Amino acid sequence: MHRKEPGARLEATRGAARPHKQGTKPMITRPSVSQLGEGKCPSSQHLQSLRHNKQHALTLTKARCCGECSTCFCTEEKSECQRHEETSPGSCNHQIMSASTISAFCATPRFKQLFKGTVEQMSQM
């Protein structure tokens, strides 16, 4: 697992003007797109189809997250998000959450309920 590398390089290029976002944002109250049901990773095929249907997935869950999660997902979204931030600061309205925040958030019953519904919708596509 190489969790730190892609983010660390990008963080360094942002300079000190923008303090670390990790941990400074409040918990989001919407489900995130990091596909984390019960802490199990979805199959790579599922992730693949999610990338293909990214717009649809975003519409379904009504939230985006580019925090990197220890159990799954999301280096692509995170770096994509940070590239946008570098070219036009303030353009990214994503929540950047640390792995522990995401894990804690995804463990909440409310999220599991919402996530379950999303998975059912996704599987009917």
From Swiss-Prot:
Pfam families: DUF5544. It is found in: Cytoplasm; Nucleus; Cell projection, Cilium, Flagellum. Keywords: Cell projection, Cilium, Cytoplasm, Flagellum, Nucleus. Residues 1-45 are annotated as: Disordered. Its main location: cytoplasm. Residues 1-12 have a biased composition (Basic and acidic residues). It comes from the Eukaryota. InterPro entries: LINC02914-like. Expressed in testes and ejaculated spermatozoa (at protein level). GO terms for cellular component: cytoplasm; motile cilium; nucleus. May play a role in the flagellum biology. This is Testis-specific protein LINC02914. The lineage of its organism: Eukaryota, Metazoa, Chordata, Craniata, Vertebrata. The gene is LINC02914.
